[in-house]
Amino acid sequence: MQLRSSLRLALLALVLLALARPATAVAEDAPFVGWSSLLPGLTLPYDVDSPNDCIAGRVQCVDQVIRQMTMRFKPLASSCDHDAIFALTYLRVTEEYRRTVETPTFFDDTSFVNHEDVLFARYYFAAYDAWAAGRTASVPPAWRVAFDAARDRAVSANGNLLLGINAHVQRDLPFVLYSVGLVRPDGTSRKPDHDRVNQILNRVTDDVIAEVARRFDPTIDDTNLPTTLDDLVLFQTIASWRETAWRHAELLAQAPTPQARDVVAHEIENYAESQARGIRMATQYLPLTGGRAARDAYCATHWAS
């Protein structure tokens, strides 16, 4: 009962965090790093006529991403690594995205969104690979908080999920959006397609939570109320983060100089990290509750179900 109460409080804390003022520095004397100078290494050109499926934004490249996500997820699942929670979630979201684009009219510019989807995944892969290789200086702070919490088995499955989403949406997504561009060649905004992704996220939320509960941690859905209120809170939190990511991408695009863009990038890093630290605090296992051990024991016999 104590664990259930803590998870409910975690959801409340996340709502408050989502309403916090964007891009607030973690500390006045935080070291300055020119993060925007790192962007060229993770860009991907876009050309619909390219023979390269990923550059052209063909759906075959999305299939490649799903295969890579599956390959990465399997060892995390079989070892009951706490990073498996976000890896599974991201895989299921991408699979639903793949099914969605079978309807060619869902997005205004499907090829472009395919291209963005692939680049977005590469940010996650790059962060995880750098962390796994011990190159922590190359890992964005929000991701370090997420990966460290998983390594230390410090937070609930709910915490692992939200730490991963926070790092990928509030940290990575602004840079991805800025990199690919916020407007079409005719000058119209790409935001309608950005917002349509929320429909995909809304469709998969319940099923993902149910699968995590079945395979890894049955307590992740202990907050479920007789209504769908808690699922609505979770989805609206993610939608709010995606809106913040778009606004932060606009700030990157509007920066008048590279130096000004570095300042915006630094604030994005600090904001995502501060959110991550708040999530970790709100979802950490309480001493002597046995939640961590019970979760790992459950996973050991259910991860393949």
Where are these regions (language model features)?
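N-terminal Sec/ER secretory leader and immediately downstream segment
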Residues: 40-115
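Hydrophobic helical h-region of N-terminal Sec-dependent signal peptides
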Residues: 11-16
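Charge-rich, solvent-exposed alpha-helical interaction surfaces
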Residues: 65-68, 72, 89-92, 96, ...
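Long acidic/polar interaction regions in large eukaryotic complex-forming proteins
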Residues: 33-35, 40, 90-184
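Bacterial N-terminal signal peptides that target proteins for export
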Residues: 1-10
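Short helix-loop boundary/capping segments
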Residues: 170-239
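C-terminal segment of classical bacterial N-terminal signal peptides
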Residues: 17-24
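A cross-kingdom marker for long, charged
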Residues: 28-42, 49, 227-305
